[in-house]
Amino acid sequence: MRTHRLFHRTIGIAASMICIFVTIAPVSAKSKVNDQNVTAVSGTVTGNVQEVGFRAMIQKQAIRYNLAGSAENNTDGSVRFTLQGDNDRIRQALKTISKGTKKSSNVNVSTSSAAVSQNLKTFTVVGWTSVSRGITHPYDVVFPLRNPDTVIKKGEVKAIWLKICESAVKGEDTGKCDKDSVD
């Protein structure tokens, strides 16, 4: 009889614990999403922003701040991009993007809020080419987000970008990503 009561108490306690866990679990998951402060923006950059390294510069900001998204040339000479990740990091990236590259001019950035895509885990430059490197065949240059989600130093960005560039290019374009080593 004593064993029977002990068994029922144990079952009752276990059932209560499961109910508490199931009730708390969704709240914890929601809190983690809020703690990450994930947001997304879409933007268009006008001015002299094509054939001046602009999309690669945007991707380097994504690498530094570990942001997902994409950058693509528009037929009207502008660049379209999306950034997704930590809101403060997006703001930092946008500051640099608004300054442009050394070769760009008349840079004007307009942004708007965009929907967050839970499955987006990369930043892609669509159809990337490089006049200064002699790369005319378009490649999609893809940066997979880092885990853990960290900000890295500017000096580390170039090495990561060169690695993903070299993994994207093929054939006669192999070895051309590093401008410092091109003859």
Indicate where each model-derived feature is located.
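Intrinsically disordered, low-complexity, mixed-charge
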Residues: A15-V22, P26-D183
